[in-house]
Amino acid sequence: MQVIVALAALSSLAAPALGFSIPRGVPVSQSMIDVKLSATGNSMVKATITNNGNRALNLLKFHTIMDSNPTRKVSIESEDGKEIQFTGMMPTYKEKDLKPSYFISLPPKGTVEHSFDIARTHDLSRGGKFTLKAEGMVPIAEENGTEITGAAKYHSNELHMTIDGEKAASVENAFGIVKRGPRSRITKRTSIDMQSCGNSQELQALTAALKASAQLSSMSAQAVSQNQDKYMEYFKDPQYMQTVQSRFQAVAQESSSTTGGGTTYHCSDTMGGCEEGVLAYTLPSQNEVFNCPIYYSDLPPLSNECHAQDQATTTLHELTHNPAVQEPFCEDNGYGYERATALSAEKAVQNADSYALFANAIYVGC
């Protein structure tokens, strides 16, 4: 098959694969940590995280309420029940060789506080009454360690805030984003920002990753109905098969060209979001994707290892975050194999990494 041959040729260039996340079979606790939200200003929120256990823990900050990047930490609904648009970043982090600085150490019964301004990542200019809550799963290492040994789910209290819209509008957005009109969706294929490509190697790598993303997504769309056991492993419920298949088809189409479409893909970081450990990130409110330096230096083009990260599936992951590809766009509900496969069907079908991991599994034969 031509697609398999092309992908095999690309994977032959791969460096050793990168794996992660919560190792298979590690315990997931429902009550190990507690998260309480409180308002400390017009749009300022404080999260107080408490270790309920009797041993010290190292909590990984990535994709949690403690993330220092302008990520979605809380869901926000207006008084009429409508979700407020998120204007921050959705990063993909490197999952191997985690550094101590990526963790927060919490002694038994100890607490740590993390404050953030929700106006930096949400349009709250209308003002009024809003309801906030946070939920997620924190990977955990033992005291002074960086090897993930477990995870803790958290569900915060509901926080009700009355926000002054004018004051909220005066807060600078994390990426200086201003409102734009809707993008044309006549041709749904990505466009590479050539000016962001500092050298031919970056452009070549991104072009190859998009091609592989298109091929992997096409294979995965077919596998949804042809490999139902694998589908159920990642997405749990047959009623979502059409939704999953449609998203893979949309990603395949979006990845199939580099000269025009609903998303803009940047070879490099032109918005300043590439903090340490970030491979790539998406601004879903703008339908833009940005690669970081370690996307090129630390990832193989295409991995032959199960549950591993590579350039192709990272690009596929990022494209699912864009509403121009398919709405509603995917969130980061569960990152890595163990967390992704622990999600409910409703969460999995809207989880970016579930699609990347499924594509990897179909290609590798996991």
Swiss-Prot record:
Chain residues in the propeptide: 20-189
Any GO molecular function: metal ion binding
Catalytic residues in the record: E318
Cofactor needs: Zn(2+)
Domain of life: Eukaryota
Enzyme class: hydrolase
Signal peptide from the UniProt entry: 1-19
Keywords from the named record: Cleavage on pair of basic residues, Disulfide bond, Hydrolase, Metal-binding, Metalloprotease, Protease, Secreted, Signal, Virulence, Zinc, Zymogen
GO annotation (BP), single: proteolysis
Keyword Kinase tagged: no
Name the record gives this protein: Probable neutral protease 2 homolog B
Species: Trichophyton rubrum
